Structure formats: C-alpha cells, structure tokens
Curated annotation (Swiss-Prot):
One Pfam family recorded for the sequence: Ribosomal_S17e
Descriptive protein name: Small ribosomal subunit protein eS17
Organism: Pyrococcus abyssi (strain GE5 / Orsay)
Primary gene name: rps17e
PANTHER family xrefs: 40S RIBOSOMAL PROTEIN S17
Domain of life: Archaea
InterPro entries in the cross-refs: Ribosomal_eS17 (IPR001210), Ribosomal_eS17_CS (IPR018273), Ribosomal_eS17_sf (IPR036401)
SUPFAM superfamilies assigned: Rps17e-like
A GO term, aspect molecular function: structural constituent of ribosome
One GO term of the biological process aspect: translation
Keywords attached to this entry: Ribonucleoprotein, Ribosomal protein
Family: Belongs to the eukaryotic ribosomal protein eS17 family.
Amino acid sequence: MGKIRQGFIKRVARELFNKYPNEFTRDFEHNKKKVEELTNVTSKKIRNRIAGYITKLVRMKEEGKIL
C-alpha cells in the first residue's frame, strides 16, 4: 500500500495549482523550485511533498482525470 499524504499538504498543493496553473509542469525539480518561490515553507521534506503532489495533479490534468 502507498503512503497517504497529510491533508494540509494536499490543501496547499491544490491552492497553488489552482492559483498558478501555468507555473507548474510534469517536472518535479521545476515544481520544487516554484513551490519554494511561491510559499514560505521552510521544511525541505514538506516542500518536496507539496511539489510531488502538484506534479501528480499536473499529470492527472493532462490525462483528463481531473478538470
């Protein structure tokens, strides 16, 4: 079974994804830098989890699984 992300990580990721839809791509490294620019998250672990979830959201949007 996979790991379950915490609710606040999903919430922050969705807020960033909806507020800045053209800033994020399928590239995790690019998204990681953008999350660092757009938020005040100080923890590297939290930043990476948010960037990973945003990467997943971008991929799902491109595949038509979310609107």
